């Protein structure tokens, strides 16, 4: 469905973007993929991987910046919203900043998508949004509800929104695996409860789930 289309990924220099971009280029050959993120160094490093590929465009910006989002969303067909404050302790210590990015940023993405006539938006979320026990989960729950409700907000523009909730993503920055690796030689393994389990998903499966959401969605789904 992405053939000859323009795709934008917010937070596109993160772990998901690094997996999504090459796989999508290979499978669908879109006209353009726009990487929208606020870290110029990460963009510079990522750009070296695609030097000479006219299908890749980099756009410095923050989802908190409504005007910049509107500029970036021009002529975009599909948006993957991956930008977020997601490290739990960081969110707890910086609650106002977490809300600005995860909730206000979501509202800006929704408005820009409607007004720029984007066809479909898939927002990345987390299983921590289900019965949240921390600020990160609470802000993502609010964000999810905004995206679901926005399917009745677009009016005649027809923009459609869906949400994908991941568990612990193997290979992503901030995942628990690097922490486990760092303490494996200490002989101690701190866990919340001996019966605790973690649901894990690979980045490859995460990308495939986003593809499925775009192809399957009618608007309002949480995958």
Describe each model-derived feature in a short phrase:
Residues 23-32, 117:
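Conserved S-adenosyl-L-methionine
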Residues 37, 59-60, 100:
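Conserved residues in the N-terminal Rossmann fold of short-chain dehydrogenase/reductase
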Residues 51, 57-78:
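Conserved Rossmann-fold cofactor-binding substructure of NAD(P)-dependent oxidoreductases
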Residues 78-81, 85-145, 149, 161:
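Conserved Rossmann-fold NAD(P)-dependent oxidoreductase catalytic core, especially the SDR/UDP-sugar
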Residues 6-26:
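N-terminal Rossmann NAD(P)H-binding glycine-rich loop of SDR-like oxidoreductase domains
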Residues 41, 64, 197:
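Adenine-nucleotide cofactor-binding loop residues
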Residues 133-136, 141-223:
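NAD(P)-dependent short-chain dehydrogenase/reductase
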Residues 28-42:
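Conserved glycine-rich Rossmann-like NAD(P)H-binding loop of the short-chain dehydrogenase/reductase
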